[in-house]
């Protein structure tokens, strides 16, 4: 009898097909997030669970899932899962690193360029008919933005995604500063990057890009005090997690001109609505689409399947998050 896996959202077909050879697969087919009460019912009979970053997988879920042995998170981050509780119960947790690195780094640079050069504002100007209404083909003072080539970028968090952003910055001949919990001297040499204390990085950078995981230490890492350290011409880009930035402080900074602009792909609450923020024209907003390329999302689905199949065969999953769990329970559904 095949073990049962429940997938909380429809993922690319390539991953589902891989799983169907080894598992009894059920997929929540609604576009909307699965209601909590339904999730708690569905997990009662499953051996494996594939989750999205928008679902809270905590003690309550585990208590309702007596057969659950592995949670495969369809994301690189896993702050939506109570890792300590999972480990205590002998439940393996996996994620999907690497396969979405380039797509997320691309989006960081897309936001950086779009914000610096008023791409979205220009698009609205054309679509609204305002350009035609003005009756002027070109004006030397319209949509003046900030140069990117040769400027200074400060990357907070130099993991896989942070390094990929730095490689793109190198192509723009940018001075690369970074702040991380630990210095990475080999990466410094490879990318000609400079390690800086956080406050110095904020003072010196023309563009500040956040690429850190959400932890107790990084919650509201960018607050009012630190926003005031940035240049008035600086632009903040967040492709990390929304709660790394104090949104109220950021709105104040954008309204009062402490910084020039922001590009945000992540928010403190998602889906997100903030009337004050949405009124501002010096911010570019996207709905958490960092990994939203065909290649990245299919790669994530394949990695989810590979993790579950490896576990079923008694092997350690390739991207196991909580390695301590191996001491508590061997991989496999037996």
From Swiss-Prot:
Organism: Pyrococcus horikoshii (strain ATCC 700860 / DSM 12428 / JCM 9974 / NBRC 100139 / OT-3)
Bilayer-crossing regions: none
Subunit structure: Homodimer.
Catalytic residue positions: 241, 270, 288
Coiled coil residues, start to end: none
GN (gene name): gyaR
Name assigned to this protein: Glyoxylate reductase
Keywords, in A-Z order: Cytoplasm, NAD, Oxidoreductase
Main location as per UniProt: cytoplasm
Enzyme class: oxidoreductase
Ligand binding (NADP(+)): 158-161, 180-182, 239-241, 288-290
